[in-house]
Amino acid sequence: MNESIVISLGGSVISGDPIDADYLQSFAKILASSKFKRIGIVTGGGKTARSYISLLRSLGINENMLDEIGIYATRMNALSLASLLKGANPIIPSTVEEAVNLMSEYRFVVMGGTEPGHTTDTVAALLCERSDTDTLINITSVDGVYDLDPNKYKDARRFDTLGYREAITLSTGSSVGAGPNVFMDITALSIAMRSKIKVIVASRDLNNLKNILEGKPSVFTSIEEKA
């Protein structure tokens, strides 16, 4: 890892009623104590986004507008986190380019979604690529990438490492219908592959995240180029 890192913080991870404030506070403390000089964080929409989208879809709102509503939910989560981080950007950027520029000014740059059709994982991968950051930590609801949904199958096997193409194949197979086994979308993985960004897929466990940031033994799946 270099002096910068990007974290994709899944919306389901920070969901509460409507947001898990205790988790965000603890998450912020861990980041503040880390060795990294620049940290980009991209937040998902979580429960807030799902609630609005579900309600408005039932009223016949078109999918493009629903995407926009989801993006604003991610930015609200981003602003909530930024308010807890000393040295974070006070205004949430609406593009990756804006976020990259802010990374030269702030230690922590927090953002949400950018445009319809781009997941926050894709935004995080683009932020890595454009800021020359070589590692992306994807915090999800499970502790890595599995061959099967671990919440449904007791014999599901977690991978310690995967190549990019292996990960894309698994993501393609699990992307029909959202669920716990959809660890990262294909576009985000393709960006990681073309720029050789190491992706660490880990759970919301904060002690585990602290160990990852400190380079200590931890539980995750690493997605990177295989020899």
Swiss-Prot record:
Q: What is its main location?
A: cytoplasm
Example GO biological process = 'de novo' CTP biosynthetic process
Keyword Cytoplasm in the entry? The reply is yes
State the HAMAP family in the record: PyrH_A
Binding residue positions for ATP: 11-12, 46, 50, 140, 146, 149
Q: How does it assemble?
A: Homohexamer.
The UniProt gene name for this protein comes to: pyrH
Chain's role:
Catalyzes the reversible phosphorylation of UMP to UDP.
EC number in record:
2.7.4.22
Compartments where located: Cytoplasm
Kindly tell me the pathway this chain contributes to.
Pyrimidine metabolism; CTP biosynthesis via de novo pathway; UDP from UMP (UMPK route): step 1/1
One GO cellular component term noted in the UniProt record for this chain: cytoplasm
Record CDD domains: AAK_UMPK-PyrH-Pf
Q: So what family is this one in?
A: Belongs to the UMP kinase family.
Question: Which protein are we looking at?
Answer: Uridylate kinase
Where, in this chain's numbering, is UMP bound?
Answer: 45, 67, 114-120
Please give the activity regulation comment for this entry. Inhibited by UTP.
State one molecular function term (GO).
ATP binding
